[in-house]
Amino acid sequence: MPTLVGSQASELDENNALRKGASDGEVSMGIKYSLSSDRVAEIAINPDFSQVEADEEQIDVNTTFALNYQEKRPFFNEGADLTDTPVDVVYTRSINNPTGVGRIISRGQKDSWVLLSALDDDSPYIVPGEEQSFTSMGGKSFSNIFRYKRSLKEGSFLGLIATDRRMVNNNGSGSVVGFDTRYRFNDTYQVEFQSVFSRTQEPNDSLVVSSATFGDNHTFTFDGESFSGNALELEFQRNTEHWRVETGYDHRTPTFRAENGFVTNSNHRRIYGQSLWIYFPNNFFSQVLGGVHASVGHNFDGVQKAKYIVLFSNLAMPRQTRLNVMYARRMQYRFKDTELNGTYDLKINLNSQFSERYQFGTNIGRHVAPVRFLEVPEEGRLTTTSFWTRMQASDRLNVGLSYNSQKMTTMDRKTDYFSGYTTTLRASYQHNKSLGFKVLIQYNDFSKDFQIQPLLTYQPSPFTIFYIGSTQNQNVNTLSYDAINAGQLTNRQYYLKFQYLFK
């Protein structure tokens, strides 16, 4: 199907004034063809994802690892169930701005597979380390992802997975190949296993510069090094109606990377166990669940990095209401060569679908946690609060609101390390079957960024689409009407799309 896409962006110039960019237009093309009843091929040239809703703000002040953002592009969500494995070697957000992408999905009674190829203009790097990850935006790349899965008896399966990304403008590359399986001995016992091997060739440029080293004195700086790595997951499960037990082992070698995946940390080995009890009282509580989880982690030098135990419970009540309570105690935690052995997490979470039209949830957390951004980390008191709600105000109007806040202080509560919040409002109005309007409004108190993204859509048929929208970001001091009016516009983009199926 041919599509006409247009856009115009404005950004701040060197004088801190908003400068309009040139208008841009291009033709996009998408072809979807059924090769057979269980096999579909799809190709997209200059695919347009500008109508996809912006990512929801996340709080990363005390986080040293890259954040995971949900894949919202419909093209990449199709077939995602096949590429989901214990080791996250496929993360389609690594294909950031494709100029061309093709895919074949085959789903048979026993054999299923997917092949995805993409040429990407702006490919991100996520470089895993022991205590942090490094991120950078690279250039053009060509990616291939293949996944094969064969179903066996009673839910067992065998699987193969392979990914390969080659940078176009330098010699950087990253490949992964692996095997995974789930084998069910009977209705009670099963084992899951995955092992993947990586081969990485770094580019020789300044995209990532760091004095830190890993493995056999490799540097995180992109200086043309090449190395291989391995990741492994092994888990044994015993499942009955009232008792479930899991025990397992996993590791990531210091040199393991997955350029098409989401692997943020390496150089760790972990042994864990979990026991879960389930009771069905058939009264006000339809299900009562309680459990314990314990884990010990080391790096590949034999240094113990963490030892903790988690107690958790879940109560199921009427109107799809669930109460979750979790307490985690870290008996030992080592970060930046500093021992922090008094940290813990306490979380209480309540979610409910109170009625067909109204859902809500809230989460409260009290923590003694490492202050990771300090040169010498210390323990601090962290308070987290969040809530969300979704409401169908009418047959045509849906509204959603979320709020997340974090505050960290010294142990004596006299000094704040940081304090702030993010909030998001979503609303959609469907005037009729063809005409609709959506708006996303969000504010990040940490970055002082206010964003609004309205979108008007008109779709009289499945293959005829017209939409027009914009994305606008402002720097504001606080979330108020006056502050928004006085806030400085930092960037703005307008876009439109017209798609029509010619017969």
What are these regions (language model features)?
Residues 17, 28-30, 46-50, 162-168, ...:
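Conserved short loop/turn motifs at secondary-structure junctions
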Residues 1-150, 159-160, 171:
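Structural preference for beta-rich elements and adjacent junctions enriched in aromatics
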Residues 35-37, 141-164, 169-197:
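Transmembrane beta-barrel wall of Gram-negative outer-membrane proteins
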Residues 106-109, 149-157, 282-286, 357:
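Glycine-rich phosphate/diphosphate-binding loops that line cofactor/substrate pockets in enzymes
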Residues 28, 32, 37-42, 101-103, ...:
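Beta-sheet entry/capping signal
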Residues 97-99, 174, 185, 191-503:
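Exposed, low-structure sequence patches enriched in small/polar residues
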Residues 4-23, 126-142, 147-149, 161, ...:
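Primarily recognizes Gram-negative and organellar outer-membrane beta-barrels
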Residues 5-7, 34-38, 44-50, 109, ...:
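An acidic- and aromatic-residue-enriched active-site/binding cleft used to recognize and process polar
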